[in-house]
């Protein structure tokens, strides 16, 4: 029997005005919900600009507990529109202990679960190790009223192991709130290589696991607060891929965009029958994957 889910993705730019950002997010969530979305996914750290371009201890003031003000705000929205909502927040767990945390709300506004980002980058303009402690909740799918969601965050999307563990634990969708873009000195050729790699690796997770993938990114130029660089041009291109990696929808790399995409969830069963990758895995030969490097 065919089973479909309508997914809303909100590709939005950000300003320094928190109130305006939240109002705009509310409008965009409402827009896709009213267009029939049952599941709505936001981008990484969507409340504010991407503050990790610089190291500033004052920016820890942006973090908040979970539950807290933002979870209250998004809980009301999820309940009002009867949607499952995937959000991405800067979590204050304790003094000096902070996480980059995805929080999932069910259709009644309750917190269905959360995921703390496991892989933390530390690259020019992406100084996340300064702000975030690596996650300690494991790769656990979050059970919701529409299914089990394998939610990870941004840099996690480059690692096949997380996607595979989510799939082995019964995830029905792989979801990645994201903040990624180009540095101003990159050539056009390099920009296209980076974007192509980003899309390809996630479509590969869809193929390898026989699951749909949802990836939602920021868009637009965000200046570097320190003035040391020209900032990040977030490349958008939020997309939904089916269980064979086929692109079902993809947003622009230049503009804000809301999309509502229908996913046929019954296809995963058939694809896994045709391509039984899970059946044929030689799990007794994979012990070396637990090593940092094999010298």
What spans do the regions from the language model cover?
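Active-site-proximal beta-strand elements of phosphoester/diester hydrolases
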Residues: 4-14, 101, 114, 141, ...
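Short, glycine-anchored, charge-dense loop/turn motifs used at functional sites
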Residues: 7, 104-112, 239-248
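Cys-nucleophile CN-hydrolase/nitrilase-fold catalytic domain and related Cys-dependent amidase chemistry
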Residues: 18, 27-107, 112-114, 180-211
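CN hydrolase (nitrilase-like) catalytic-core segments centered on the catalytic cysteine
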Residues: 63-86, 148, 154-258
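Short beta-strand scaffold segments in enzyme catalytic cores
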Residues: 87-89, 101-104, 140, 238-240, ...
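Residue-level detector of high-confidence beta-strand sites
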Residues: 101, 114, 250-252, 260
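A short, polar/charged loop-to-alpha-helix boundary motif
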Residues: 117-131, 255-272
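Cysteine/selenocysteine-centered motifs that mediate thiol-based redox chemistry or coordinate metal-sulfur cofactors
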Residues: 139-169, 178, 268-295
């Amino acid at each position: 029997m065919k089973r479909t889910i309508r997914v809303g993705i909100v590709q939005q730019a950000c300003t320094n005005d928190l109130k305006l950002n939240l109002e705009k997010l509310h409008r965009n969530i409402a827009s896709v919900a009213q267009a029939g979305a049952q599941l709505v996914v936001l981008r990484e750290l969507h409340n504010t600009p991407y503050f990790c371009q610089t190291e500033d201890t004052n920016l820890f003031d942006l973090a908040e507990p979970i539950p807290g003000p933002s979870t209250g705000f998004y809980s009301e929205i999820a309940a009002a529109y009867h949607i499952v909502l995937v959000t991405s927040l800067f979590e204050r767990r304790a003094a000096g202990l902070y996480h980059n945390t995805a929080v999932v709300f069910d259709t009644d506004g309750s917190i269905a679960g959360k995921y703390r980002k496991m892989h933390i980058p530390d690259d020019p303009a992406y100084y996340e190790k300064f702000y975030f402690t690596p996650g300690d909740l494991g790769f656990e799918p979050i059970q919701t009223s529409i299914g089990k969601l394998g939610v990870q965050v941004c840099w996690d999307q480059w690692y096949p192991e997380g996607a595979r563990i989510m799939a082995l634990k019964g995830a029905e969708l792989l979801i990645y709130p994201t903040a990624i873009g180009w540095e101003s000195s990159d050539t056009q050729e390099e920009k296209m290589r980076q974007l192509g790699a980003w899309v390809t690796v996630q479509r590969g997770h869809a193929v390898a696991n026989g699951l749909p993938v949802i990836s939602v990114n920021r868009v637009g130029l965000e200046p570097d607060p320190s003035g040391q660089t020209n900032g990040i041009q977030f490349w958008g291109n939020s997309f939904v891929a089916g269980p064979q990696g086929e692109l079902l929808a993809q947003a622009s790399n230049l503009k804000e965009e809301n999309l509502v995409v229908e996913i046929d969830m019954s296809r995963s069963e058939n694809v896994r029958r045709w391509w039984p990758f899970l059946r044929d895995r030689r799990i007794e030969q994979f012990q070396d994957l637990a090593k940092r490097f094999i010298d």
